[in-house]
Design a protein with these regions (language model features):
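Glycoside hydrolase catalytic-domain groove-lining segments
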Residues: 543-558, 562-633, 648-652
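Extracellular carbohydrate-recognition regions
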Residues: 17-37
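Aromatic-rich peripheral "rim/lid" segments of glycoside hydrolase catalytic domains that contact
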Residues: 483-495, 666-716
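Active-site clefts of carbohydrate-active enzymes
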Residues: 362-370, 426-436, 528-542, 611-650, ...
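Polysaccharide-binding and catalytic clefts of secreted carbohydrate-active enzymes
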Residues: 300, 310-311, 318, 325-376, ...
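Substrate-binding cleft of secreted/luminal carbohydrate-active enzymes
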Residues: 461-465, 469-471, 635-686
Length: 716
């Protein structure tokens, strides 16, 4: 990461004896602060106000100086007007601005929806053994490991998410700190936020007083292997952890009794719609309507329907790559072992991602454990159980990225997702995949081919709609047009852009005058891959970015509706938010707008002014570290009880919101403790890697799910 820092002559006077003030906006000189990675700032009225644009980097601010923090055990940042962004990063560095690792310490600072908050982070005790182990766990998500070691227990009524973590990455010589930076990690939207003070607090910090577990002091030869025969973290215990196949049998019997006692909500039709609610016209498929001021989906029987269910209903959630780290695992089956089949079971939707990451040796711990639990015919048994579980738990949806054969059992409505991989805009980078050129004929051809590949789902009345693509990197209002200009002369969208400009300006000289460029002709416009001054070309860049977005959505809709007029086009699942131009374009062509919204609730969410469309949450989750994997996902909570309470509140906030027509949890089962293709190893399932339900979550699902429709109808 590139760090550009301000120079300060000396550190400010400490606020309390022993405290070290690293930054105070009330006394700082405006010339002492510089931005990093495209951010801008204003130092005024005792606040350092920072503006950050969408970026693939780490925009923020940084201060340099000379500080001895050896007598300090905690660092606190005073935020004002924290904005909508949920997590900032505080980074302390020794000399040289080295990357993550030696010479730096990174703290994740959670703040969401706060007008004013002081967020602090404890320095952990020095553990050289753990520092030696953590780098060997890459690419597994390791930022939360300090929570397991020094878990900062909250006060009564205080969420762990609202307390600061201990430093998660890197080592630091506290006696020679030279730089302090506050920034956002690759923001997708513009943000404005302010910092008043950054203070290192005297004392040891609360983390130093907490007992350190034995495994955190192990040497590597003691720590490895750290994954047991069931795919669980070997060195910790928690309720319902599996130690033998007999534990699986006991859990199966326990759940069977629970399902028999809870067959599902009353007053639902076969689709999970509101049979006791109003009768609307039957269309034979799923549609949308606004009833009593709120958006709804309508099921094929003409009943109001609100989508509630999990993403990735598959027996292969805990598939993990083995490349170069067989020593992580206490047991992997030998060739010829009956369980060697689980080297080849796979999550079909995510397998292309493993290939893209060049992860070809994999093992499926989740399917292995399910086979041990249910025996011969395990796949068929588990598939039928998945439908039974969902209805019992108050759900009516199998959300996208789930097992196709389970969806096609026609017992639970489902949505699917496909991705278009045609010729990309060569100058575009970022996101899961490069953005495809909608003006290239291959785009429509690929969109049409997908409807052929998914023909069974398109013809299935239980499939209510499709997401197309996922979490595109849209950038700013001019990004797609700038990406077009960076592309070669034969890029179709670049030729279309040339034609639009030629029609508008006629002569290249007029374009040059407006853009402050020096093209010799329209042919050179095509061949040049440098970009103009964005301010001079702003109007044209933004207009063509809109045209690309509209062409993208238009073609997808046309091909989807050509194949199946009765299926809903559910958009592309924006990551948290989306720039205005793509929301407006999607509103023209999508039946439902979709966002992946990782927040604690949705009460503050709103569409841009002038847009009134139904919204579907494609992903959300919360995790805790009292069970299973050592990563809690994107929102960390204290424990499973708090996760259950927060789940109820999130879904209730969506039910009370007039535009949400459903929420989809990510994901049905925990990810592998040893990580998937990109290292994700999150405790975010409704079941763990051994197929054991998290009973606190099940109770929460039923609490809100069984009253889904009365809650939606009443609302606010």
């Amino acid at each position: 990461m590139r760090i550009i820092c301000a120079m300060t002559a000396v550190a400010c006077a400490a606020a309390m004896a022993g405290d070290v003030v690293l930054f105070d906006a009330a006394t700082a000189d405006v010339n002492s602060v510089r931005a990093q990675d495209g951010a801008s700032f204003e130092l005024k009225d005792g606040l350092l106000t920072v503006k950050t644009a969408p970026s693939d980097a780490y925009p923020g601010v940084c201060v340099s100086g000379k500080w001895d923090l050896s007598g300090c055990g905690r660092v606190e940042v005073e935020f004002v007007n924290g904005g909508i962004y949920g997590r900032y990063t505080l980074r302390l560095l020794n000399a040289g601005g080295v990357p993550a690792g030696k010479g730096s310490k990174i703290f994740k600072l959670p703040i969401r929806g706060e007008k004013h908050a002081v967020i602090g982070a404890d320095f952990p005790p020095d553990l050289p053994e753990l520092d030696a182990i953590v780098p060997q766990l890459k690419p597994v998500r390791v930022w939360a490991i300090p929570y397991l070691v020094w878990a900062p227990f909250p006060k009564p009524g205080e969420s762990l998410d609202r307390r600061a973590p201990v430093g998660g990455v890197g080592t630091l010589d506290r006696s020679a700190v030279r730089q302090v930076a506050v920034y956002i990690n690759k923001p997708l939207l513009p943000h404005t936020w302010s910092v008043r003070r950054i203070v290192a607090k005297a004392g040891d910090g609360a983390a130093s007083a907490r007992p350190v577990p034995a495994w955190a002091k192990m040497k590597p030869d003691q720590f490895f292997p750290f994954i047991d025969a069931y795919g669980q973290f070997k060195h910790r215990e928690w309720p319902d952890k599996v130690h033998a196949d007999a534990d699986l049998a006991r859990q199966r019997a326990k759940e069977e009794a629970d399902l028999a006692a809870h067959p599902g909500p009353k007053g639902w039709d076969k689709w999970g719609g509101w049979a006791d609610g109003p009768q609307l016209p039957k269309t034979g498929g799923f549609s949308t309507t606004k009833w009593n001021g709120k958006w709804w989906i309508v099921d094929p029987d003409g009943h109001l329907w609100w989508s509630h269910g999990p993403v990735r209903v598959t027996p292969s959630c805990a598939t993990t790559p083995l490349d170069d780290h067989d020593h992580w695992f206490a047991r992997l089956p030998a060739k010829g072992d009956p369980e060697a089949e689980f080297y080849s079971t796979r999550d079909k939707l995510l397998f292309p991602y493993y290939a893209r990451w060049k992860k070809y040796r994999i093992y499926d711990f989740s399917a292995q454990n399910i086979a041990r639990k249910y025996g011969t015919g395990w796949y068929e048994t588990w598939s039928a159980l998945a439908h039974r579980r969902l209805r019992s738990w108050g759900c009516n949806t199998i959300a996208n990225s789930s097992d196709r054969d389970i969806c096609l059992m026609d017992r639970t409505p489902y949505t699917d997702r496909y991705e278009i991989h045609s010729r990309p805009i060569a100058g575009h980078k970022g996101g899961w995949w490069d953005f495809c050129d909608p003006f290239d004929p291959s785009f429509r051809a690929e969109a049409r081919q997908k409807t052929v590949e998914y023909r069974r789902q398109f013809e299935d009345p239980w499939c209510f709609g499709f997401f197309v693509d996922n979490e595109h990197h849209w950038g700013q209002a001019d990004t797609l047009a700038l990406s077009t200009l960076k592309s070669p002369a034969d890029q179709p969208c670049k030729r279309v852009f040339r034609d639009r400009l030629k029609a508008k300006y006629g002569e290249i000289a007029k374009l040059n005058a407006q853009w402050k460029t020096s093209y010799t002709g329209w042919d050179e416009f095509l061949s040049v891959t440098t970009t103009p001054d964005p301010k001079a070309a702003k109007e044209d860049l933004e207009a063509f970015t809109v045209e690309i977005a509209e062409e993208y959505y238009r073609i997808i809709r046309e091909e989807l509706k050509r194949a199946a007029p009765g299926k809903l086009y559910l958009g592309c699942r924006w990551a948290g938010g989306a720039p205005l131009f793509t929301v407006k374009a999607a509103a023209k062509y999508c039946d439902v707008l979709s966002y992946n919204i990782y927040r604690r609730h949705l009460r503050e969410f709103k569409l841009p002014d002038g847009i009134d469309k139904p919204i579907l949450v494609g992903e959300f989750h919360f995790g805790a570290l009292d069970r299973g994997p050592f990563c809690p996902g994107l929102i960390l909570l204290k424990d499973q009880e708090e996760r259950g309470r927060t789940y109820v509140d999130y879904v209730r906030s969506a039910l009370e919101h007039p535009q949400f027509v459903g929420v989809h949890w990510h994901q049905f089962s925990d990810q592998a403790t040893s990580g998937r293709f990109d290292g994700e190893n999150m405790q975010v399932g409704w079941t763990d890697v051994c197929d054991t339900p998290y009973w606190e979550t099940v109770r929460a699902l039923r609490e809100i799910g069984y009253d889904l429709y009365p809650t939606r109808a009443a609302g606010k």
